[in-house]
Amino acid sequence: MTQDQLKQAVAQAAVDLILPKLDDKSIVGVGTGSTANCFIDALAQHKGAFDGAVASSEATAARLKGHGIPVYELNTVSDLEFYVDGADESDEHLNLIKGGGAALTREKIVAAVAKTFICIADASKLVPVLGAFPLPVEVIPMARSHVARELVKLGGDPVYREGVLTDNGNIIIDVFNLQITNPVELETQINAIVGVVTNGLFAARPADVLLLGTSEGVKTLKA
């Protein structure tokens, strides 16, 4: 199977997992990126089975609306049963690196609200140790140099992602060459740097379920 076929398979598996638990009042949290887009397309086939969605980015909101799925502001939603999103890396404990698409802050907020965080990914994203994929950090623009110096102290090689502004108007620094043996600790350390909005480690709040697309079919891992 191609990578696109694996993404479509896990997206459909996520729809199959949540659909029996949805009703006409349900609102679904939706992530950002190519795998999340596959989920949106699959979910749209059942748009009469739930109320609407909360989007983690402007791009996701536009895709949902394009399918005729109502999009709600998170502040107006009191109950979010599911959040479904992809990942750039996952370890066996379902700690994740996310943010390749620069939507990490809103993704992390929606994930924090959701009762169940379902991560969907192809098999290449499962790794023994996080960090081969550079860790994105969302930063207030005036703090860029300060944050970069602090990230060097933590052992990383920070690189400014040129030409990218987040939906929140901030910049992204990608941190290379981190061996992330304690994701929760590193997530806390980086978030404590003045000027950091948040970083792409989802470890304090990891995924609850990982649906992994493999050549043998979709495998389910739980934290």
UniProtKB/Swiss-Prot annotation:
Keywords: Isomerase. Gene3D superfamilies: 3.30.70.260, 3.40.50.1360. The active site is at E107 (proton acceptor). Substrate binds at T32, G33, S34, T35, D85, G86, A87, D88, K98, G99, G100, G101, K125. It comes from the Bacteria. Pathway: Carbohydrate degradation; pentose phosphate pathway; D-ribose 5-phosphate from D-ribulose 5-phosphate (non-oxidative stage): step 1/1. The keyword Mitochondrion does not apply. It is an enzyme of class 5 (isomerase). SUPFAM superfamilies: D-ribose-5-phosphate isomerase (RpiA), lid domain, NagB/RpiA/CoA transferase-like. Signal peptide: none annotated. Its EC number is 5.3.1.6. GO terms for cellular component: cytosol. PANTHER family: RIBOSE-5-PHOSPHATE ISOMERASE. Homodimer. NCBIfam families: PRK00702.1, rpiA. This is Ribose-5-phosphate isomerase A.
